[in-house]
């Protein structure tokens, strides 16, 4: 593993006796999804969680487990991910942010770190999340290949807008998930659709999401937009939940964790 921070600088923050980890902190972090093999720790692969925990272990000489607002799959980006963990007082929060950003080697950027209540948990304290999905018609520009779903033809925007109210509200979304068990009851508060130039922005806000749920919802809207199936079929998918029944899963490259909401 390559470190951008010189080892002597790391040693300057060490202490001979490990202090009690008594400070609960929250970070706001953005990252490029294609630089990691997802968020959660996986053997033999670099993930956001593993790299962050390695950095904290190096600084604090102790295993520190971090908790994110939610996991992101390989290739999925984060504009505003939130991660909480316990540390001690050996260095300031601003110094910690600076060191972690250098350790990230331009794969992530930590915007801020702040102390939070000891009972705060990045995942369990979250009330809602917004995901952004980006579709781009600019198929000849390779700069966008890792940042959007490249589509070679125009979608029927009016049909997609008509499909949105069907998906909003509380439903069993198991047909829009790759989860093995039927725990599909979720509430989508709002879906916003915006088209600018050659790009389509889909914002989906809900109280929680199943595995692959956002990507399969986008896949369903795509199928509506190309007239592969109609609005009645979309209703049928909700009324007859079964794992993966919606079939089409939009590419990870277009998905962004946009915001997480706390009280």
UniProtKB/Swiss-Prot annotation:
Positions contributing to substrate binding: 131
InterPro entries per the UniProt record, alphabetical: PsdUridine_synth_cat_dom_sf, PsdUridine_synth_TruA, PsdUridine_synth_TruA_a/b_dom, PsdUridine_synth_TruA_C, TruA/RsuA/RluB/E/F_N
Isomerase as UniProt keyword: yes
CDD domains named among the record's database cross-references: PseudoU_synth_EcTruA (cd02570)
Keywords: Isomerase, tRNA processing
Top-level lineage group: Bacteria
A UniProt-annotated Pfam family: PseudoU_synth_1
Reactions accelerated catalytically: uridine(38/39/40) in tRNA = pseudouridine(38/39/40) in tRNA
A GO BP entry: tRNA pseudouridine synthesis
Positions annotated as active site in the UniProt record: 73 (nucleophile)
An MF annotation (GO) of this entry: tRNA pseudouridine(38-40) synthase activity
The keyword Isomerase is assigned to this record: yes
EC number: 5.4.99.12
Coiled-coil segments on the chain, per record: none
Family from the record: Belongs to the tRNA pseudouridine synthase TruA family.
The protein's role, per its UniProt record: Formation of pseudouridine at positions 38, 39 and 40 in the anticodon stem and loop of transfer RNAs.
Subunit structure: Homodimer.
Full protein name: tRNA pseudouridine synthase A
